């Protein structure tokens, strides 16, 4: 009886491990994944260009193979904003495996984010930055993938773990709390321009926040308003609504890695999730232009196209506050 019990325990552990650690294994940095996209439409590039130009988040269908495993009726669109161009041959991709077929996934992963390594001849910025960030706060796993499109090698991409419900479960132990992607619909590059920075309250009506925050949970607008209101009216109570330690780590990491395409630049490219302690946690995102690749530091023309590494290293840590907040 004892040996039979031990046998079943080992079976259970084996099955559990394959689920719990599948995402980490898929993103191991010593592995280069092979991903093949076979679009249903011959003019797939024109269709994706059109969706991007029109500002639509629609997807077109394709079959996708990942390390030899094939998935059908997958939804594909471009990923990102500044890294996409209709003039580019190599654009970034957002691949949704369960777009049509419910629960379709690869080793527990239902969405792939492939970055085109724009402005990074070293191919190291994004993967290295996430590796550093994960030592101090929850952040995506990332490695590399060779991408083939309709049988043609399209190039080497960075393969970045999506910040989604699976990510939330793994890092926070829950997935249903208020969850926001903090990216404005229309980026405002002017000094003092409104973006997804928490110094700006848009009132108690959720409609005022829609242009700046994309809600990815079933509820949470009132929680976001409470966070912003507390930060701006009763800052002494900040620790009741915000994980201050992780917030400081995010700012420190952005400054140390000279990553200005983030909160400290335009006030964008981060997530907020309300944990079980009722504190919002920032989640760093979009590190493809770290180590000085992004030149517009504070939504002004202060250093646009001209600042050097020395200037970046000695930048005032309050530059974002002085120009934006």
Pin down the residues of each PLM region.
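Sec-dependent N-terminal signal peptides
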Residues: 5-18
């Amino acid at each position: 009886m004892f040996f039979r019990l031990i046998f079943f325990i080992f079976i259970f552990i084996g099955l559990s491990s394959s689920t719990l650690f599948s995402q980490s294994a898929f993103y191991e940095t010593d592995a280069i994944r092979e991903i093949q996209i076979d679009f249903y439409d011959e003019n797939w590039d024109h269709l994706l260009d059109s969706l991007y130009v029109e500002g639509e988040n629609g997807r077109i269908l394709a079959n996708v193979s990942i390390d030899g495993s094939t998935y059908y009726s997958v939804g594909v669109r471009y990923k990102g904003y500044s890294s996409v161009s209709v003039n580019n041959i190599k654009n970034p991709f957002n691949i949704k495996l369960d777009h049509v077929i419910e629960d379709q996934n690869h080793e527990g992963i239902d969405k792939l984010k492939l970055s085109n390594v724009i402005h990074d001849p070293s191919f190291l910025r994004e993967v290295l930055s996430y590796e550093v960030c994960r030592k101090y706060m929850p952040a995506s796993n990332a490695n590399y993938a060779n991408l083939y499109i309709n049988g043609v090698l399209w190039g080497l991409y960075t393969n970045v773990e999506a910040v989604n419900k699976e990510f939330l479960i793994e890092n926070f132990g829950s997935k249903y709390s208020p969850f926001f992607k903090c990216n404005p619909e229309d980026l405002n590059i002017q000094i003092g321009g409104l973006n997804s920075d928490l110094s700006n309250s848009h009132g108690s009506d959720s409609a005022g926040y829609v242009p700046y925050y994309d809600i990815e949970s079933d509820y949470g607008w009132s929680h976001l308003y409470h966070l912003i209101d507390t930060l701006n009216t009763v800052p002494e109570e900040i620790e009741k609504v915000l994980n201050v330690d992780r917030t400081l780590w995010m700012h420190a990491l952005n400054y140390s890695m000279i990553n200005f395409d983030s909160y400290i630049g335009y006030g964008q490219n981060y997530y907020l999730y309300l944990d079980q302690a009722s504190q919002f946690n920032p989640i760093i995102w979009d590190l493809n232009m770290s180590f000085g690749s992004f030149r517009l530091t504070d939504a002004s023309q202060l250093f646009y196209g001209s600042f050097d590494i020395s200037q970046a290293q000695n930048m005032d840590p309050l530059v974002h506050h002085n120009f934006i907040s």
